């Protein structure tokens, strides 16, 4: 999907739906990762969630979002949905998205951002140690799904929308930077296995 409103809508969902949940989660000691599921037809929000590893180390943002999605009564078919991840999914989350039948996912931050800007290198370490892959070494477009970076969608927009979306991107990055600082200062007190 490359509708001219897609980049704007995904950024709005991150800023207004996922970030508040993540701020609450980080205040409890969870990591900064979140996700949401939207309808392709009208870009309406189905569910948004955030990391909840203090409850269960498998409740990464994406997997916790899938858990909440499957707890809904009536659910759309996953082929009719967009999967939005604040951070490029780790291998567990990519597999969960695949097993759930999604044909896409969109990410705001990359694995390299998780390592460099958030001091959480585990995604890249697992890709290297378990699968022998360098950063970006997995197939971002494959028989199961196509993945996209929101920054690429923003770059494809025309001004003045592009300028507006870049300003929103900067605001979101600043908010995540603050949340990351908060998480990093408190993580020694949690019992998350790969904190």
Listing of model-derived features with the role each one plays in the protein:
Residues 46-54:
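Short beta->alpha transition motifs characteristic of CBS
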Residues 42, 89, 111:
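Flexible, active-site-proximal loop/turn residues at the rims of small-molecule/cofactor binding pockets
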Residues 28-32:
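Short, flexible loop/turn motifs enriched in small residues
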């Amino acid at each position: 999907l490359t509708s001219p409103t897609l980049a704007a809508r995904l950024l709005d969902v991150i800023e207004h739906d996922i970030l508040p949940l993540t701020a609450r989660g980080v205040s409890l000691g969870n990591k900064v990762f979140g996700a949401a599921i939207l309808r392709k037809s009208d870009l309406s929000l189905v569910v948004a969630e955030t990391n909840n590893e203090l409850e269960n180390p498998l409740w990464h943002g994406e997997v916790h979002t899938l858990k909440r999605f499957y707890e809904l009564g009536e659910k759309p078919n996953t082929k009719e949905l967009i999967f939005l991840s604040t951070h490029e999914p780790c291998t567990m989350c990519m597999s969960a998205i695949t097993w759930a039948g999604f044909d896409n996912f969109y990410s705001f931050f990359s694995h390299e951002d998780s390592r460099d800007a958030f001091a959480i290198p585990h995604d890249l370490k697992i890709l290297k140690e378990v699968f022998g892959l360098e950063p970006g070494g997995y197939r971002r477009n494959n028989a199961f799904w196509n993945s996209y970076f929101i920054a690429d969608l923003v770059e494809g927009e025309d001004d003045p929308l592009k300028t507006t979306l870049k300003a929103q991107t900067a605001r979101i990055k600043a908010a995540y930077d603050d949340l990351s600082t908060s998480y990093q200062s408190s993580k020694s007190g949690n019992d998350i296995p790969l904190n």
